[in-house]
Amino acid sequence: MVLVLGLAAPVAVASVASAAPVYCKLNPTFTVPQVIWVDGSGSSQTTRLCARVSPGRYVVQRGPYAGHVGRNGVAAPGAKREGDGKTPYGSYPMRGGFGIYANPGLASSWLRTSWRDVWVDDSRSALYNTHQRLPANGRWASAERMRLSPAYNYAQVIGYNERRTRGRGSAIFLHVDQGRGTAGCVSLPTSSLLAVLRWEKPGAWIWITQ
């Protein structure tokens, strides 16, 4: 018996190379493990989630996500003022989250808001730029309500002006996008915002540029 052996067709072997990392253009002095990089252009912005891989070097782990900053853009360094419709430039710690709905997965404190929760924006008040609860009882003349839908369905406090310097701006949050520039906050569509909140670990900072 004679066996006739066929020749197998050559199989192309493709080398699988890992995608080259995309580095974040951040302040080289950063040492925190995670940075939310928000790059503004007019009232629009692009957010990238950056993780440290070595001292001063960060790679993009998530994003880009499109959203908005202040309706009047990003303020020049140190130039942010109360009511100017601008988002403050610079780097700030991310603080606790809050919202109408339950914590979606943020690994930090979460406040389920009620109609009584407000953030004081009266620069003459001793409680300027802090979370308080109604009634005001003369303690402030104006405040941002924290139970607003859809903007504050999910939100997180950006640790801006924590020294509470009068007139330098208050109530700067990361919150749900409404399709237009904000009063000074950073906003993202709900799906993108939830991705950010679930990615974050305690100790993350935000870096806002233009």
What do the PLM-derived regions correspond to, one by one?
Residues 19-182, 193, 198-201:
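Cell wall/extracellular polymer interaction/catalysis modules
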Residues 185:
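Short cysteine clusters
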Residues 188-210:
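Long, compositionally biased interface segments
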Residues 1-19:
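Secretory targeting and sorting signals
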